[in-house]
Amino acid sequence: MANPITQAFFDAWTLISNADSDLISVLGLSLRVSLTATVIAGVLGAFLGVLLATIPFYGRAALISILNTLLGLPSVVVGLLVYILLSRAGPLGPLGLLFTPTAMVIAQSILITPLVAALSRQAISQTWQEIAPLLKSLGLPRWRIAMTLIEQTRFALLIIMLTAFGRAISEVGAVIIVGGNIAGVTRVMTTSIALETSKGEISFALALGFVLLATVLVINICAGLAKRDQAIVG
């Protein structure tokens, strides 16, 4: 008789190699939610990064401090706040977004936007110090300066986006609160791993774990390639 742990690993590999439909469904939803949240956070975060790096204004230092503080914001707190906003008694309750993928996107976006903004500000600030005199001498409008800075820091921003995506797809606290972990609707890899483990379905949990690890590995490889290209160009 095979060892239960060995059998669980074997069954997990079988699920992956056979492209189990439930596994693919969970993976697909995870990617859609996290990619959407990353795009939203990328746009908002890059805008804030440019703003904080190039334009001095009253309260700028305080805003930077708040952003840095939000980097350590617990995901369950984000989930709780979004839950309150989207609940029936909340201000956005009539929209009926609670326990939907949209609610999960909102939670993940709030969670990773400070990360993108803080890291973007650091990257853009360094480039701004180097080329600010040139850009100012050309008399470019602010939007053109912003686009130039984004273009000049594109590799750094790509790495930041990959980091944010990795943070989003591995998140569990917020999405399980606002999504409800509903099968076929809001069940993603992390919440499914937690559920299947509690049910004793170790094989399926392991299969999801392997897929999640593979996803993170691909992200790290892409980030490494981006760093290499940045070093070559820069």
Name what the model sees in each region.
Residues 4-14, 21, 78-110, 179-182:
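Membrane-interfacial helix termini and adjacent extracytoplasmic/periplasmic loops
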Residues 16-18, 178-217, 225:
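Interhelical loop and adjacent transmembrane-helix boundary motif
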Residues 29-37, 70, 143, 147-159, ...:
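Alpha-helical transmembrane segments of multi-pass membrane proteins
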Residues 34, 38-50, 76, 80, ...:
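Hydrophobic positions within alpha-helical transmembrane segments of bacterial inner-membrane proteins
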Residues 36-67, 142, 149, 222-227:
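Transmembrane-helix boundary motif in ABC transporter permease subunits
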Residues 119-120, 142-174, 228:
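Transmembrane alpha-helices
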